[in-house]
Curated annotation (Swiss-Prot):
Protein name: Abl interactor 1
Region feature Disordered, mapped onto this chain: 159-290, 306-375, 388-421
Source organism of this protein record: Homo sapiens (Human)
Residue span(s) of domain SH3: 446-505
Residue ranges with Low complexity bias: 248-258
GO biological process: actin polymerization or depolymerization; cell projection morphogenesis; cell surface receptor protein tyrosine kinase signaling pathway; dendrite morphogenesis; lamellipodium morphogenesis; megakaryocyte development; negative regulation of cell population proliferation; neuron migration
Length: 508
């Protein structure tokens, strides 16, 4: 308030008086400059003096106007703030009056109403009659309720002519063996994990043969009679699992023990005895070696026949070739070989064709039959069951299916890694690792893993390796097409990855 009073009484009036004095001084200075310019002899000097007076006068007037304007603006700001404070006070008084009026109105309204008495009670009220607690009854856990659930192969047993599923428990393994049989790669896969342990299984009764058990006459080379199965089930069998690419081996070994399921072979072509050619597609490693299929007479024995005469010539190598028929016929090759693989159809004992090597014309290979049941290679059974082979009659083979699939022009997928089943000690790979204590001098310093060959392989190209079964190979690179690069006996080259197994699978 004092500042406002000082501006109104002193600053602004003094500024106005200064402006009036400047106006009068400017008039006198103008008269002097005009007379001086007329009377002076040196016109230039008189002009310069006039300019100096003019500049000084303008500066003085401008300063005085600026000071007076600032004082007026400051006065206006002070008055505006006072007005805002007064407005706020008036609003506060108005709100106070409104509140007082509302209180009075409520009081008057309350006089016209009646009082309401409310009883205060607890929100939660305990029940009058307490319920008796129910006694806990423990129910035992039934570990067999989920035995028939899932995609695994169910065991079948023949009882009074009816097929009834037999339940099995969880499998485990106590002492894992350090060797495994060199069964060829299969396309059938199980559903158990890769590291599932196993244990010794109890023998089960032989199953009955379903209607879709065999789908091709060529399969009869791998079929065995239930009599053999019955004799096999008289002793416990130990199965060992492995990790990595042979994980499905464990599942099949645990869910179909003792069931002689044959490996499917390609359906016979309908072109008769004419020569045909199988163009091998490139881009995948070759499957294990292929051997001619055996006729049915060498596999299925008649009742009462001598075991030695029917099974004396069967070896693990022949059963391996029979089980790899589907893999070799449906799998591809990494590159086109210089000499095309050639096959011809020959008459079979049961009317189906056999394949042998001849010079032939071009035709697509037949596709494999649909897999109605999981396939398990039968390897190493013959040495154990020759004495009991004639105990049971041989069931007749079922008729082939009516719906044979058409040929597929798309190239078949490459064969999967080997899927073996450790059923017999006679079918394991006997290998001796001379480098178990330390790597040899020719071994590479940096390698991915050390593997053992489970099949013999002869190179087709100069950049490939040749090795025998049981050879130790150091893998230095794994290609996406299934071929590995490794070192064996100071020789570096390529080899198919499904011909070897990691040594860790044997030592686990």
């Amino acid at each position: 308030m004092a500042e406002l009073q000082m501006l109104l009484e002193e600053e602004i009036p003094s500024g106005k008086r200064a402006l009036i004095e400047s106006y009068q001084n400017l008039t006198r200075v103008a008269d002097y400059c005009e007379n001086n310019y007329i009377q002076a002899t040196d016109k230039r000097k008189a002009l310069e003096e006039t300019k100096a007076y003019t500049t000084q006068s303008l500066a003085s007037v401008a300063y005085q106007i600026n000071a007076l304007a600032n004082n007026v603006l400051q006065l206006l700001d002070i008055q505006a703030s006072q007005l805002r404070r007064m407005e706020s006070s008036i609003n506060h008084i108005s709100q106070t009056v409104d509140i007082h009026k509302e209180k009075v109105a409520r009081r008057e309204i309350g006089i016209l109403t009646t009082n309401k008495n409310t009883s205060r009670t607890h929100k939660i009220i305990a029940p009058a009659n307490m319920e008796r607690p129910v006694r806990y009854i423990r129910k035992p856990i039934d570990y067999t309720v989920l035995d028939d659930v899932g995609h695994g192969v169910k065991w079948l047993k023949a009882k009074h002519g009816n097929n009834q599923p037999a339940r099995t428990g969880t499998l485990s393994r106590t002492n894992p063996p350090t060797q495994k049989p060199p069964s060829p790669p299969m396309s059938g896969r199980g559903t158990l994990g890769r590291n599932t342990p196993y244990k010794t299984l109890e023998p089960v009764k032989p199953p009955t043969v379903p209607n879709d058990y065999m789908t091709s006459p060529a399969r009869l080379g791998s079929q065995h009679s239930p009599g053999r199965t019955a004799s096999l089930n008289q002793r416990p069998r130990t199965h060992s699992g492995s990790s990595g690419g042979s994980g499905s081996r464990e599942n099949s070994g645990s869910s179909s023990i003792g069931i002689p399921i044959a490996v499917p072979t390609p359906s016979p072509p309908t072109i008769g005895p004419e020569n045909i050619s199988v163009p091998p597609p490139s881009g995948a490693p070759p499957a294990p070696p292929l051997a001619p299929l055996l006729p049915v007479s060498t596999v299925i024995a008649a009742p009462g026949s001598a075991p030695g005469s029917q099974y004396g010539t069967m070896t693990r190598q022949i059963s391996r070739h029979n089980s790899t028929t589907s893999s070799t016929s449906s799998g591809g090759y990494r590159r086109t070989p210089s000499v095309t693989a050639q096959f011809s159809a020959q008459p079979h004992v049961n009317g189906g064709p056999l394949y042998s090597q001849n010079s032939i014309s071009i035709a697509p290979p037949p596709p494999p039959m649909p897999q109605l049941t999981p396939q398990i290679p039968l390897t190493g059974f013959v040495a154990r069951v020759q004495e009991n082979i004639a105990d049971s009659p041989t069931p007749p083979p079922p008729p082939p299916p009516d719906d044979i699939p058409m040929f597929d022009d798309s190239p078949p997928p490459p064969p999967p890694p080997p899927v073996d089943y450790e059923d017999e000690e006679a079918a394991v790979v006997q290998y001796n690792d001379p480098y178990a204590d330390g790597d040899p001098a020719w071994a590479p310093k940096n390698y991915i893993e050390k593997v053992v060959a489970i099949y013999d392989y002869t190179k087709d190209k100069d950049d490939e390796l040749s090795f025998m079964e049981g050879a130790i190979i150091y893998v230095i690179k794994k290609n996406d097409d299934g071929w590995y690069e490794g070192v064996c006996n100071r020789v570096t080259g390529l080899f198919p990855g499904n011909y070897v197994e990691s040594i860790m699978h044997y030592t686990d």
